[in-house]
Amino acid sequence: MSTERYHAAVFGATSAIAIETMRALAAERPAHFLLMGRNHDRLETIANDLRQRGAECDVATVDLLNPDEDWKQRLDGARWDLFYIAHGSLPDQAETLADRHAIGREIDINFISPARIMSVCASILEDQQQGTLAVIGSVAGDRGRQSNYLYGSTKAALATFTEGMRHQFAGTPAIKIVLLKPGMTDTPMTADLPKGPLFSSAEKVGHLAWRAIRKGKAVAYLPSWWWVIMNIIRHLPRLIFHKTSL
């Protein structure tokens, strides 16, 4: 175990997957977390849990959807090992598509806000010339499907944005850009969905996420067998694909 403290800023720190990722990190090495999100009480509860696990924690109550929110000042004066962007939303597609304002909000939550934050964090990593930026995407972005194409399209956009940023830093090997692609995960965001054998626990996905971050993987399907499933779905001929109810 390394004795040097690992500094991580977590955006959307109330995410169930992010919480388990931080727990896995704290179990492996000394850590300092800056937890950011809107729900102050929930952030403090998470911070106290992590402190009991030996981590140092600071909390910043911010609205990550507000482009005028000055959260960047909380990052000044420190050298960051990890920026972890974890906020997102899984909308009811039919209801959301019926409301043009709701469509814009979901695109903001799942793509525009993460992309904006990634841009700021990337400039910090460029100044440092090292560090990791990890963002939670989804297997839903691999192919547009009738059941969730609104959500999936935002995650596809996020994947493309992340890939481009990774290309930007290809000449700086000490900077890692990691896209985490969970499959169906048992979290509060999926509480209303019927659970099946393809669901994984947030704890399992969070631990796998930390492993991928630690290794600096470019793209990580969580669990890895989702790559097989999505590879099949991606390569289904259109005529066959359109006969499915995916």
Which positions does each model-derived feature cover?
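Residue(s) in the substrate-gating loop at a strand-loop-helix junction
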Residues: 138
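Conserved glycine-rich Rossmann-like NAD(P)H-binding loop of the short-chain dehydrogenase/reductase
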Residues: 29-45
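Conserved glycine-rich cofactor-binding loop
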Residues: 14-15
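Active-site helix of classical SDR
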Residues: 118, 154
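C-terminal helical subdomain
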Residues: 179, 194-231, 238
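Conserved mid-core segment of classical short-chain dehydrogenase/reductases
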Residues: 88-104, 147
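Active-site loop immediately N-terminal to the catalytic Tyr-X3-Lys motif
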Residues: 143-149
